[in-house]
């Protein structure tokens, strides 16, 4: 997987953001999913900033989709920093785009 999006040292992670509420749900919206070859599947999860350990369950994308909510498996508070992580399963290449809220 191309990790050029990563803005940190953690494998397959980037796009750090802080929570602006105490709600234990993160949201991901996949607005672009263009397959260039093969049958890639992109699994995404939210991790505490500075690690790739799952703070939410992972969700696997195979195309565009409306907002998906991922529940945290730990207590969260406003101001805590998290980052989006991803891993590719299946062979091929895809271009993805979207947005997320911790």
Segments the model singles out, each with a brief description of its role:
Residues 1-102:
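Post-signal peptide N-terminal regions of Sec-secreted extracellular proteins
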């Amino acid at each position: 997987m191309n990790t050029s999006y990563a803005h940190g040292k953690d494998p397959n992670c980037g796009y750090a953001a802080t929570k602006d509420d105490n709600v234990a749900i993160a949201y991901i919206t996949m607005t672009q999913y263009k397959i260039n070859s093969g049958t890639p599947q992109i699994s995404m999860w939210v991790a505490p900033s500075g690690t790739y350990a799952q703070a939410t369950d992972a969700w696997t994308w195979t195309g565009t989709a409306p907002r998906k909510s991922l529940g945290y498996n730990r207590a969260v508070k406003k101001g805590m920093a998290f980052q989006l992580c991803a891993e590719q399963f299946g062979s091929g290449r895809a271009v993805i785009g979207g947005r997320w809220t911790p």
